């Protein structure tokens, strides 16, 4: 099973301390997502001017793009505290009530994976978001009674990688909604250069660009690759990260110029060599490469689809012309479902 991939956008347990050190603290230091930054700066300034809590904020998009970082920045810009939790952790209504009643006025409550909130907990959240009130039950059995508690005005920042799983009543209660997009190579180069400065590593523009190109449009991956390249530069070079040093380090780490690792290449080659490029069903593909359906669907496929190397069709997965050209292979003649992918050879 694919775990702890170097190019995985999911966070890893041993990265948290370093990630905290290199995360930007203010909007002016946040690279990329220009439209979102400009809008958030206006909303925050307006809320501060009125002395009110910022409207509730929903941030969605692929993992590793900076949702947690943005929640911390919002709190810093507002000059308030931020409390962190996640959907799976809030198992009971009382868990959420305890968090809400301990907030100070205008504090930020950050709920990661908010799409995984249970229905009972979500019901408690509705009046809290809308009216700054919650209903809690006191006692048990016939003597039980409901009391209404007033909450201080607060800002809920919800983050999710799967916005489509949010219920309409919850989604409609967010006044500010932003989707985070993948980053350009130029933006990632700036992020890598900034992180290198914070880590005390010397890096050239070419070195930063080389790391950025292989980072799959994702800052979390860029920072992870930078740390590994820094190790390589320290031991195998003079400590300075040049384009050549970064390239050699990443080749040794099995990350190619497209940001693909061994798992990506195995998936693509299996489709092309064993299934003639497809269409191939997900179950057959999972059995052929020894992975679970969910791993292919949620971990391996998204980036390959986004880059145009795999296409989902009603009949199954298909390797595109880009996939064949990437490996120096000749795309086969196609008919029917795949004619539009390969054209006439």
Swiss-Prot record:
Q: Which GO terms describe its cellular component?
A: cytoplasm; Holliday junction resolvase complex
EC code(s) of this entry: 3.6.4.-
Major localisation: cytoplasm
Positions that bind DNA:
293, 312, 317
Annotated region Head domain (RuvB-H): where? 257-345
Recorded superkingdom: Bacteria
- What are the boundaries of the region Small ATPAse domain (RuvB-S)? 184-254
Q: Where is this region: Large ATPase domain (RuvB-L)?
A: 1-183
- UniProt: Mg(2+) binding residues: 68
Q: Which InterPro entries match?
A: AAA+_ATPase (IPR003593), AAA_lid_4 (IPR041445), DNA_helicase_Holl-junc_RuvB (IPR004605), P-loop_NTPase (IPR027417), RuvB-like_N (IPR008824), RuvB_C (IPR008823), WH-like_DNA-bd_sf (IPR036388), WH_DNA-bd_sf (IPR036390)
Gene Ontology MF annotations = ATP binding; ATP hydrolysis activity; four-way junction DNA binding; four-way junction helicase activity
Q: What is known of its domains?
A: Has 3 domains, the large (RuvB-L) and small ATPase (RuvB-S) domains and the C-terminal head (RuvB-H) domain. The head domain binds DNA, while the ATPase domains jointly bind ATP, ADP or are empty depending on the state of the subunit in the translocation cycle. During a single DNA translocation step the structure of each domain remains the same, but their relative positions change.
Tell me the function of this protein: The RuvA-RuvB-RuvC complex processes Holliday junction (HJ) DNA during genetic recombination and DNA repair, while the RuvA-RuvB complex plays an important role in the rescue of blocked DNA replication forks via replication fork reversal (RFR). RuvA specifically binds to HJ cruciform DNA, conferring on it an open structure. The RuvB hexamer acts as an ATP-dependent pump, pulling dsDNA into and through the RuvAB complex. RuvB forms 2 homohexamers on either side of HJ DNA bound by 1 or 2 RuvA tetramers; 4 subunits per hexamer contact DNA at a time.
Spell out the family assignment given in the record's similarity comment. Belongs to the RuvB family.
- Designated name of the protein: Holliday junction branch migration complex subunit RuvB
Q: Which organism is it from?
A: Methylococcus capsulatus (strain ATCC 33009 / NCIMB 11132 / Bath)
What lineage does UniProt assign to this protein's organism? Bacteria, Pseudomonadati, Pseudomonadota, Gammaproteobacteria, Methylococcales
